[in-house]
Regions:
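Membrane-proximal basic amphipathic "stem/tether" segments
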Residues: 226, 231-274
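Conserved donor NDP-sugar-binding/catalytic core segment of glycosyltransferases
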Residues: 96, 100-130
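Conserved nucleotide-sugar donor-binding catalytic segment
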Residues: 131-219
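A conserved acidic beta->alpha catalytic loop
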Residues: 35, 43-52, 92
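Glycine-rich, basic loop-to-helix element that forms the pyrophosphate-binding segment
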Residues: 66-83
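Acidic helix N-cap motif at the loop->helix transition within catalytic regions
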Residues: 20-23, 48-56
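N-proximal low-complexity "stem/linker" segments adjacent to membrane-targeting elements
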Residues: 1-30
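Short aromatic/hydrophobic "clamp" motif used to bind/position activated sugar donors
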Residues: 88
Length: 274
C-alpha cells in the first residue's frame, strides 16, 4: 500500500517553555517512517528558547505558531482547527514516540476505527520505567468512573474532535469529557493496540485529585442522568482499590457476570447506609 493510501495523521504538539525537552519530541515525529504526517506545533508564547528550537525544524512542520492561549485545551483546540488529517494525535512536549516505525505499525493494525488506543510508558528523570498503561477489555462507563485514556497514545478521527472540541472551562478533565461524549454516549468505535506507542516524561499536570473529582462530577451532571451520577458518587465512596480490583476481575470472562451483580449490590448497600 502506498503512503497516500494510508490516512493523513495530524500530529499535534502543545508546548510552553519546553526548550529542554521539545527537540526530542520533534525528532520522534519527523523521523517516522510513516510518510503521511502533518505536524503541527502550538506554542503558548514561550520565552525560554523553545521557539528557536521549533524554527530549527520549521521546514518539517506543516504549521506552527507561538502565541498566548487560555490553557492547554485551548491550545489543543487550535491544533484541531488547523489540522487537515483524518486522525489527530496529541504528543506533549517532552514525550516521544517509542520507535520511528510506530505510526506505520498502528495504521497497519487499524485505520478504520474512530479511535485507536495504545499504551504509554512512563519513565522518571533517570529514564527508568515507572509505569505502563494497561488497556481494558472494553471502554465503558465503569472504566471511566476511575480512569481515562492517555491522549498521547490515542489516534482520534478529526471529525469527532471537530464535532465536540475540548471544553476550555475545564482545566484537567476535558479529554475525559470528550471520551464520555464520543465513546460512552456516542457509541463510536474503539480499537485497542496492545503495545506501547509513546514514552512519557514526568510532569506535574493533572495531579490535583480534588480538582479532578470536582470537574468529573460537574461533567457527569452535565452529561448523564442523575441516578448515574449518584452511582458514580457511591462508587467513589467504596474506594479506588475496590473498583480497581473490580475492573481487573471484569476482564475475566467467567466471573464478569458476578462482578456486575456484586457492584450493583454494593451500590445499593452504600445508598441504604449513606
Amino acid at each position: 500500500m502506498s503512503a497516500y493510501n494510508y490516512p493523513l495523521i495530524s500530529v499535534i504538539t502543545v508546548s510552553y517553555n519546553a526548550v529542554l525537552t521539545i527537540e526530542q519530541t520533534i525528532l520522534s515525529v519527523i523521523n517516522q517512517t510513516y510518510l503521511n504526517i502533518e505536524y503541527i506545533i502550538i506554542d503558548g508564547g514561550s520565552t525560554d528558547g523553545t521557539v528557536n528550537v521549533i524554527k530549527k525544524y520549521a521546514d518539517k512542520i506543516a504549521y506552527w505558531v507561538s502565541e498566548s492561549d487560555k490553557g492547554i485545551y485551548d491550545a489543543m483546540n487550535k491544533g484541531i482547527a488547523y489540522s487537515h488529517g483524518e486522525y489527530c494525535n496529541f504528543i506533549n512536549a517532552g514525550d516521544k514516540f517509542c520507535s520511528s516505525s510506530i505510526l506505520k505499525q498502528v495504521m497497519d493494525f487499524n485505520h478504520v476505527a474512530d479511535i485507536i488506543v495504545g499504551q504509554d510508558l512512563h519513565v522518571n528523570e533517570h529514564n527508568k520505567i515507572v509505569s505502563r498503561s494497561v488497556l481494558p477489555r472494553r471502554y465503558n462507563l465503569l472504566h471511566f468512573y476511575i480512569t481515562t485514556i492517555p491522549h498521547q497514545s490515542c489516534f482520534i478521527r478529526a471529525s469527532l474532535l471537530k464535532k465536540y472540541y475540548y471544553d476550555t472551562s475545564l482545566k484537567i478533565v476535558s479529554d475525559w469529557k470528550f471520551y464520555l461524549q464520543s465513546i460512552v454516549l456516542g457509541g463510536h468505535s474503539v480499537a485497542a493496540y496492545n503495545n506501547v506507542i509513546v514514552i512519557c516524561n514526568p510532569r506535574g499536570a493533572s495531579s490535583d485529585n480534588n480538582r479532578i473529582k470536582e470537574e468529573r462530577e460537574k461533567v457527569l451532571k452535565d452529561l448523564l442522568q442523575a441516578y448515574i451520577v449518584n452511582d458514580y458518587q457511591c462508587l467513589s465512596c467504596l474506594g479506588e482499590e475496590f473498583i480497581e480490583n473490580a475492573l481487573f476481575l471484569f476482564n475475566n470472562h467467567w466471573i464478569r457476570f458476578l462482578v456486575k451483580k456484586g457492584l450493583a449490590i454494593m451500590v445499593k448497600i452504600v445508598r441504604i447506609f449513606k
